[in-house]
């Protein structure tokens, strides 16, 4: 049975991102090719547009002196349970991954008001 290109595209569209990445890797290995775009020498064209970062990671670096307030803020932001929020507050670490700029700034403001030191990366 021969599949049409449309059937193949539809089948790929139904897969998750991880499954598609595995498929690409398998195709690369099977046919000895790379899915990376070819690198061309810079021509006398317009300068490359610098893309603005759209996803940010919010990292708790220090809980400060108001640990209870920071734990409450961490719970509100992450939805974690009390123990998990306490552990994260004490150890520091990633609060939110892939947040929008507005969301990252909002989280930073809430935690800074509670007394924590927060970085946006």
Swiss-Prot record:
GO cellular component annotations of the record: cytosolic large ribosomal subunit
Tagged with keyword Ribonucleoprotein: yes
GO molecular function per UniProt: mRNA binding; structural constituent of ribosome
GO biological process, any: translation
Highest taxon listed in the record's lineage: Bacteria
Keywords: Ribonucleoprotein, Ribosomal protein
InterPro entries: Ribosomal_bL12, Ribosomal_bL12_C, Ribosomal_bL12_C/ClpS-like, Ribosomal_bL12_oligo, Ribosomal_bL12_oligo_N_sf
Protein function: Forms part of the ribosomal stalk which helps the ribosome interact with GTP-bound translation factors. Is thus essential for accurate translation.
Family, per entry: Belongs to the bacterial ribosomal protein bL12 family.
Quaternary structure annotation from Swiss-Prot or TrEMBL: Homodimer. Part of the ribosomal stalk of the 50S ribosomal subunit. Forms a multimeric L10(L12)X complex, where L10 forms an elongated spine to which 2 to 4 L12 dimers bind in a sequential fashion. Binds GTP-bound translation factors.
The protein's name in its UniProt record: Large ribosomal subunit protein bL12
Gene of this entry: rplL
